[in-house]
Amino acid sequence: MIVYQDLLSGDELLSDSFPYKELYNGVLWEVEGKWVVQGAVDVDIGANPSAEGGDEEGVKIRLVKVVDIVDTFRLQEQPPFDKKQFLGFIKRYIKNLATKLSEERQAEFKKNVEGAAKMLVSKLSDLQFFVGESMHDDGSMVFAYYKDGATDPTFLYFADGLKEVKC
């Protein structure tokens, strides 16, 4: 199994269990998330609760709907950004990330990241923002949105911000 960690914070953000599609010459990865139902069933097979003045229900089901990627990697949702805040974040993130890349990859990243950033700005009002479990200030941001008519979210990752770790 391969886990993808945030290059800046070390948080686990994705794994090879979730296939991705490259966008903007590999700058962004697009990953389809799914709503899943999780829960536990409590079955009470004890004495007759009605005779003891208790609850007459013998089975209690606690179900919760979660997005698989958010739940698996314990992503933490962040408040939305306005355009000015988002541009400030993107500039700082690109600067921090570029220092971690090889010179060759830096040039390729800087050439293609502008198109990816423009696309994110164009979807800004539709995006949800997530960070890794540590909530590191300078870590990668994971973006989620719903494609037209979709019931499951689509996630976007900066590919260069991920480090592959074999488990």
UniProtKB/Swiss-Prot annotation:
Keywords: Calcium, Cytoplasm. Its main location: cytoplasm. SUPFAM superfamilies: Mss4-like. Pfam families: TCTP. One of its GO terms (cellular component) is cytoplasm. GO terms for molecular function: calcium ion binding. Disulfide bonds: none annotated. The keyword Calcium applies. Belongs to the TCTP family. Involved in calcium binding and microtubule stabilization. This is Translationally-controlled tumor protein homolog. The lineage of its organism: Eukaryota, Viridiplantae, Streptophyta, Embryophyta, Tracheophyta.
